[in-house]
Amino acid sequence: MAEQESLEFGKADFVLMDTVSMPEFMANLRLRFEKGRIYTFIGEVVVSVNPYKALNIYGRDTIEQYKGRELYERPPHLFAIADAAYKAMKRRSKDTCIVISGESGAGKTEASKYIMQYIAAITNPSQRAEVERVKNMLLKSNCVLEAFGNAKTNRNDNSSRFGKYMDINFDFKGDPIGGHINNYLLEKSRVIVQQPGERSFHSFYQLLQGGSEQMLRSLHLQKSLSSYNYIHVGAQLKSSINDAAEFKVVADAMKVIGFKPEETQTVYKILAAILHLGNLKFMVDGDTPLIENGKVVSIIAELLSTKTDMVEKALLYRTVATGRDIIDKQHTEQEASYGRDAFAKAIYERLFCWIVTRINDIIEVKNYDTTIHGKNTVIGVLDIYGFEIFDNNSFEQFCINYCNEKLQQLFIQLVLKQEQEEYQREGIPWKHIDYFNNQIIVDLVEQQHKGIIAILDDACMNVGKVTDEMFLEALNSKLGKHGHFSSRKLCASDKILEFDRDFRIRHYAGDVVYSVIGFIDKNKDTLFQDFKRLLYNSSNPVLKNMWPEGKLSITEVTKRPLTAATLFKNSMIALVDNLASKEPYYVRCIKPNDKKSPQIFDDERCRHQVEYLGLLENVRVRRAGFAFRQTYEKFLHRYKMISEFTWPNHDLPSDKEAVKKLIEHCGFQDDVAYGKTKIFIRTPRTLFTLEELRAQMLIRIVLFLQKVWRGTLARMRYKRTKAALTIIRYYRHYKVKSYIQEVARRFHGVKTMKDHGKHVKWPTPPKVLRRFEEALQAIFNRWRASQLIKSLPASDLPQVRAKVAAMEMLKGQRADLGLQRAWEGNYLASKPDTPQTSGTFVPVANELKRKDKYMNVLFSCHVRKVNRFSKVEDRAIFVTDRHLYKMDPTKQYKVMKTIPLYNLTGLSVSNGKDQLVVFHTKDNKDLIVCLFSKQPTHESRIGELVGVLVNHFKSEKRHLQVNVTNPVQCSLHGKKCTVSVETRLNQPEPDFTKNRSGFILSVPGN
């Protein structure tokens, strides 16, 4: 039941009518048409009235409103039925089909396009490129087929002159992966002749109006439509179709689908050749047939890539083989014209079939493996010509109306007859509803040996000249007593029928008078073999492939081909069988008037269509019947999770009992009936509620399964990780053990080696032991060092420690650290170094020891110092374990300044061989000096000074910062300055000079 619409628009579902009667049905249909509501439901059938105007109800917003919704949730629409078919296909993996029926001009083709548009819009949410390509090609194929298969008729500006059934293939996710198109009975006679007020196929007009000047010149065409005999009837007609614009649309669509440029060019050449064929005129000179305008033959030969003489011969002669003899039989003027027209019709029909085949080659599913990709399901869309009643109804209308009888029979079988039969078979209480079964009309046309088609085939196979009048006579004799057949001979008082020309069939849609003129010829569908050989021998490979039977030898005897009517009958039977195997959804199209007006609702015209479409009977069956039925097993399989009594498995005696328990649990027992093998649900709402409950439970089931599966995965991962960690642990243990064993092997006996293993190369450790290797090497180096110093006297150990400290601080930063000599330390007390003054210095040192109570002398030396006033003087420094003294040697080593060592923050030295050193203090009163020695001259003592001070600070667990830079940064009473070192060749001894940034220490060059 449809919802979401106000009652001012009438009943959205005819099932909701207060009384089921034709007046109420028509009143509701008219009201909805006048209010712009062109769609109405009959349960799951959509009734569509052609609005004859554009409506803004097919956009993206509307698509989103219907996507995934149930039928009753939204107002009636084509999108609702399309979504229902799509959901049924996706949910139940069931092939579905949408059958669009109605008479010519009722809007079937437009409906099929909107359905395709909707399916394309709601699929492929992941935007897979291949799926998008397939969707695009399926949509584009519509406009190509319309161009070559549709035409303007008196009833419809875009009338389908062929039948089309398209299968859209979907993968297991519901995305389109391909398709296949079947075409039925192209009205090829329209190529050569049209009724007044009608046109030939759109393709001819599009080429002439839309082709460029250059293209038309290459095809020897001109834009004037009246210049071509085959289309001049419709040349003067005013049409709402923009042929020039459509030409570009079709050309672009062919390119998108995958037609190669040479294939598209061949299509245009064939169209041009047909137009030129129509302009050929024949005459007879004596007994010789001639072509009046021979130049046109050359143009046709050029366009068909054949030789001019071969084209001319095929048009004027017919090759006849009698035994081994081959005879060229001349045509009469009439026979030549007939052959020309048959040739034009055949070329166009082959072209159309080739276009369909080419599209199928491109869009068909390839390399689809159900074991890998899952089940391949199908939605079929049938857009076939509607019921036709013209002023002059010929063979084509006979076939078209037979097709509609077959489709009506299918509707009756599936919707009316089978439905009622199933209720009786399942034991469901049911009141029979009468309906007209058109099986008798179908049998009248197609019955073996007795039907009209069988009689027509017999007439075509008779030896000798058989006329259409003879065929009508056969119909009269064999079908004279049939209640749905009549002719003037059978009903002499019926003056509507013409003697020896007309017969009438009482179709389900109304009485139709057919003219037998042309029935025999059109059924034989004769085309001389000469034309087939002509095109098979074309140098154009596309044309050649269209005519494979042309390769047969002239003398080869072939089986009589099936007639056009029999071929069509067989294709209709196959189509109906195909549709019957799928779950059908119906769109019943109604034409509101014959004037193509958006304002007129012709009650009589519409009532007639409602009657013959059986819509009122459809409403009665729907109101009395059930919306859904399913076997107990399948129903249980789908919905068992919504009841605790059936999930995960039931323990009841049968599936039927389990289904009853499930329905009672949900509270739907008043809306169902239980058959012998199936459950029947009356209203769609109950089914949709079941679907909602199922969807809710599926979320919980999925979450439960996810939880269990994630737990399983976590346990599996834990076990794998634990096993991996065990392997890693054992492997690391193995690598560590191997490494330790290798170290032990290599360093075995190092105690007895002269260098205590210095030359032994360490093995490469595993990554995990790299830091351990560093620690191990440190331990080894300490051990080796301990072995080396064992032989040294205890008095030398402080000097060794100082040298080590100097190396740690200065190695790689200064060249000469004085490591090779013995470090004297207290050079001021050394007689070799200061023989004249050592005697003076020693008493001063002793007095300072008594006064300041220092324990050890760390370093003493003569220096040259510079102060903040840029005054350079010779001084001496005396460093003990407590103080740093600056002394004046000229005044018997008088102490000029005392700096406690705890006030010392660091040392700065240069990176050269000079003896510059800056003592940094906490009060920013740095001491800048240059060490110098007297014996030997220029001895480097920087390394010694740094080593003893660093070693002393380390022993007191303090850190002394040592900087190696050039220039050296310092601070004199808070003023920042720099001391840079320069080497000068003529400099006799180190000396300080002032510059802008501080001082320069000039030292002698080498």
From Swiss-Prot:
N-acetylalanine: residues carrying this PTM: 2
Record keywords, A-Z: Acetylation, Actin-binding, ATP-binding, Calmodulin-binding, Cell projection, Cytoplasm, Endocytosis, Endosome, Motor protein, Myosin, Nucleotide-binding, Phosphoprotein, Protein transport, Repeat, Transport
Cellular localisation: Cytoplasm; Perikaryon; Cell projection, Dendrite; Early endosome
Ranges where the Myosin motor domain occurs: 9-695
Region (Actin-binding): 572-594
Keyword Acetylation: yes
Domain (IQ) ranges: 699-719, 721-741
Molecular-function annotations in GO: actin filament binding; ATP binding; calmodulin binding; microfilament motor activity; protein domain specific binding
GO process terms (BP): actin filament organization; actin filament-based movement; early endosome to recycling endosome transport; endocytosis; protein transport
UniProt-annotated binding residues for ATP: 102-109
InterPro entries in the record: IQ_motif_EF-hand-BS, Kinesin_motor_dom_sf, Myosin_head_motor_dom-like, Myosin_TH1, MYSc_Myo1, P-loop_NTPase
Modified residues (Phosphotyrosine): 536
GO cellular component terms given for this protein: actin cytoskeleton; axon; brush border; cell cortex; cytoplasm; dendrite; early endosome; endosome
CDD domains with a match to the protein in the record: MYSc_Myo1
Residues with Phosphoserine modification: 200
TH1 domain location: 812-1005
Quaternary context: Interacts (via the two IQ motifs) with calmodulin. Binds an additional calmodulin chain via a third, C-terminal region. Interacts with F-actin.
Record-stated family: Belongs to the TRAFAC class myosin-kinesin ATPase superfamily. Myosin family.
Domain notes: Binds a calmodulin chain via each of the two IQ domains. IQ domain 1 mediates interaction with calmodulin both in the presence and in the absence of Ca(2+). IQ domain 2 mediates interaction with calmodulin in the presence of Ca(2+).
Described function: Unconventional myosin that functions as actin-based motor protein with ATPase activity. Plays a role in endosomal protein trafficking, and especially in the transfer of cargo proteins from early to recycling endosomes. Required for normal planar cell polarity in ciliated tracheal cells, for normal rotational polarity of cilia, and for coordinated, unidirectional ciliary movement in the trachea. Required for normal, polarized cilia organization in brain ependymal epithelial cells.
Name of the protein in its database record: Unconventional myosin-Id
Annotated source species: Canis lupus familiaris
